[in-house]
UniProtKB/Swiss-Prot annotation:
Signal peptide: none annotated. Pfam families: ANAPC_CDC26. The APC/C is composed of at least 13 subunits: apc1, apc2, nuc2, apc4, apc5, cut9, apc8, apc10, apc11, hcn1, apc13, apc14 and apc15. Interacts directly (via N-terminus) with cut9. Residues 37-54 have a biased composition (Basic and acidic residues). The gene is hcn1. This is Anaphase-promoting complex subunit hcn1. Keywords: Acetylation, Chaperone, Ubl conjugation pathway. GO terms for biological process: anaphase-promoting complex-dependent catabolic process; positive regulation of exit from mitosis. The modification N-acetylmethionine is found at residue 1. It comes from Schizosaccharomyces pombe (strain 972 / ATCC 24843) (Fission yeast).
Length: 80
């Protein structure tokens, strides 16, 4: 098996700065994503119990079977 000489890598100060800037940008992006998630969590904890119930029912697909205008006790079209 043949061996070849290792490739020499030269890193300049500009390369280091570019790397540091990229790492800083990634850190800031992840922090902003974390902050957005925390804000969404805070919003959901501030909702009233009734609003939470409505949101939950919409999320899992529960719908009201009778429209209030069709309910017999409210004088809707379904009267006999």
């Amino acid at each position: 098996m043949l061996r070849r000489n290792p490739t020499a890598i030269q890193i300049t100060a500009e390369d280091v700065l570019a790397y540091d800037e990229e790492k800083l940008r990634q850190t800031l992006d992840s922090e902003s994503t974390t902050e957005e998630a925390l804000q969404k969590n805070e919003e959901s904890t501030r909702l009233s119990p009734e609003k939470k119930k409505i949101i939950r029912e919409r999320r899992i697909g529960i719908t009201q079977i009778f429209d209030s205008s069709m309910h017999p006790s409210q004088g809707g079209a379904a009267q006999s």
